[in-house]
């Protein structure tokens, strides 16, 4: 059995799910956004400076979710799912490619910087498929809010992958992504491809 790596955002669909979710949460709570605007602005600037780090996003993530009870957060995530699916632009050629790999008996591993809980909600058909494993960023409750405990990006993708399949360090037959930020994972791929916004692939040497 071959393992196949797929990124999600920019590869299987064009949008950045985590970015769309953060914008949704800011927009859906206008009163809270206005009252906390100076703090949110500071958190956003902090994120721009340290965008690749888990702790770089956490102040903004904490403020956006502050004061939300779990039931309310679940309702908002369901509302986000409806809005996101109405607007998302799938990369059909890559979805077809993934389907072909599965039909050939391959095991697909989707590793995404988006929240794993969001992916599971928006795309339950992926997370429930016996030939697909989804790995994403992790969160946990913290002081009346929610924070990221692990950001699934860059080298962290490789760490989370190895944790999921420990003690085996799997190698991929083929890998697909839209970004060379996934180079640590691509180095585990026998064949690695970059995907453009039209779904066309280019071999990475």
Predicted regions, residues:
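Active-site neighborhood of HAD-like aspartate-dependent phosphohydrolases
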Residues: 1-50
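Generic structural signal for well-ordered secondary structure
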Residues: 14-15, 54, 154
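Alpha-helix initiation and N-capping motif
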Residues: 15-18, 57-58, 70
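Broad structural signal for hydrophobic residues in well-ordered alpha-helices, predominantly aliphatic
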Residues: 25, 62, 122-123
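Helix-loop "lid/cap" segments that line or gate small-molecule binding pockets
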Residues: 48, 56-67
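Short leucine-rich amphipathic alpha-helices used at interfaces
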Residues: 50-51, 93
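Glycine-/proline-rich flexible loop or hinge segments
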Residues: 55-61, 77-82
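C-terminal cap/substrate-recognition subdomain and adjoining C-terminal extension
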Residues: 71, 75-78, 82-205
